[in-house]
Amino acid sequence: MNYGKEQVAVYRTYANPLEGVRTIPESSFDGRDNILFGLEVRVQFEGEEFLPSFSEADNTTVVATDSMKNFVLHQAGEYEGATAEGFLHFVGTEFLETYPHVEAVTMSATEYPFDERPVPGDDGFDPSDLVFRVSDDESAFGEIYLEREGDELRFEEQTSGVTEIELVKVKENSFTGYVQDEYTTLPEREDRALYISLDVFWTYSDPEDALGDEPQRYVPAEQVRDIAQVVFHEVNSNSIQDLIYQIGLRVLERYPQLESVNFEANNRTWIEVRDDLDGDAKVLREPPRPTGYQQFSMDRSDLEEQ
């Protein structure tokens, strides 16, 4: 039994910057200014006190979802951290402290991506600190679950992620050796272009690390995105399953503070129309529906087996 508010768009200018994150070989990302910090937030309340609103049309204990929206918007001005997960934890804690009859709250959000825009400077072009482009690129994701236990609040569940990574590798991918029977019409490919859409999610051994209070232990979505594209560049994979497994191993290797990593992938590979051109040139077209997908979960035991 739960209810809540979703698609709460909130924007904060000049939030505190994310600084001091640990750098990795696959990424140049070392922090962000957070001059423009935007989230689409979802709030979910749980509690037995809400049962009469369902069974008896008694709204005595109901916090209107419009009030939830206003609460989130107000707290965006109070939050002093630098991460989506930290904001969600902050707001969730404030909800539980404000409404003692709420037993648990799930807070989730997708971060709106904004790109810095180059403007002329003294020595060429520099990123503007005033103008940003609203981007259609991948987005960071966060979810936290807080519950009441007596007089204490427990925080033991979280998920972080980066969604809608879209990558195309023009060659050095294959797909061979799969089941061949009377239903098979797909030809094997020793070398093909590969187009994938990828969502990556991860959990920490200690959920507190997700909040960003200790930046060295925080895993930025930008770095995980960069790991995915670097591994895609390096690996000649024989399937998307093989590719996401290699990405997962690299993520777990780079971040010993993580407990697990999960994938949802979609195959959007273009179909070859002509391969009789010079060199590696090909003509391709959009694939027809339906499309293939893959889901996979890994934890530290997978890394230890390597």
Curated annotation (Swiss-Prot):
Residues at which urate binds: 65-66, 175, 192, 240-241, 267
InterPro entries: Uricase
Swiss-Prot/TrEMBL keywords: Oxidoreductase, Plasmid, Purine metabolism
Active site residues of this protein: 5 (charge relay system), 65 (charge relay system)
UniProt pathway annotation: Purine metabolism; urate degradation; (S)-allantoin from urate: step 1/3
Disordered: annotated segments: 281-306
BP-aspect Gene Ontology terms: purine nucleobase catabolic process; urate catabolic process
GO MF term list: urate oxidase activity
Recorded catalytic activity of this chain's protein: urate + O2 + H2O = 5-hydroxyisourate + H2O2
EC number(s) from the headed UniProt entry: 1.7.3.3
Domain of life: Archaea
Function recorded in the entry: Catalyzes the oxidation of uric acid to 5-hydroxyisourate, which is further processed to form (S)-allantoin.
Family designation: Belongs to the uricase family.
Name used for this protein in its record: Uricase
